[in-house]
Design a protein with these regions (language model features):
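Phosphate-binding/catalytic loop of phosphoryl-transfer enzymes
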Residues: 1-39
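ATP-binding/phosphotransfer module of carbohydrate and carboxylate kinases, centering on a glycine-rich
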Residues: 28-163
Length: 163
């Protein structure tokens, strides 16, 4: 099958829907706007002890702000059963699916495959978002090395050995 790009990758500032930096931006802005539920805010304070000025400095003045922002994903995963975080996770995944899956013709007749830690860690939420949107997920692979080796053995090496 021929694939072609429908949606450009816009990076963590303009895009990156459903990524660690996408969710990290939400967490940090919610924290700085005092919108986090108290138990999450208190836990954030206890775990990180970051002031507004420190966060602003790391995001706007230090190198690799995307790495800093995405580094809060384990904290978000720890709180994913809280309705405030859970709702945002599911809505973020729906946004990802709208932008990167629904752009293809007949997407509802195809199945989608996901690779990576975040999709594996958010499997339940991803399944829920996809189901609500009529998207069929065929597989979620946390670490693709094993399946890649299997593919190469089955399709690439096999052909080379026959010829």
């Amino acid at each position: 099958n021929d694939l072609h790009e429908e949606v450009p990758a816009l990076g963590y500032v303009l895009g990156d829907e459903g990524s660690g930096s996408y969710y990290g931006k939400f967490l940090l802005s919610s924290y700085l706007y005092n919108k986090l539920p108290k138990e999450i805010s208190d836990s954030f304070d206890k775990k990180f002890g970051l002031s507004k000025d420190e966060i602003i400095d790391k995001v706007y003045k230090q190198p690799n702000p995307n790495v800093f922002i995405a580094s809060f994903m384990p904290f978000i995963i720890d709180w994913k059963n809280n309705p405030f975080i859970s709702d945002f996770i599911v809505n973020g995944l729906k946004h990802f699916l709208e932008v990167h899956v629904c752009c293809y013709q007949n997407y509802e007749k195809s199945s989608v495959h996901f690779v990576g830690s975040l999709s594996a860690l958010l499997k339940e939420e991803l399944d829920m978002a996809a189901k609500e949107m009529g998207i069929v997920i065929n597989s979620i692979v946390q670490k693709p090395v094993g399946p890649l080796v299997d593919y190469h053995i089955k399709y690439i090496l096999d052909k080379q050995l026959v010829n």
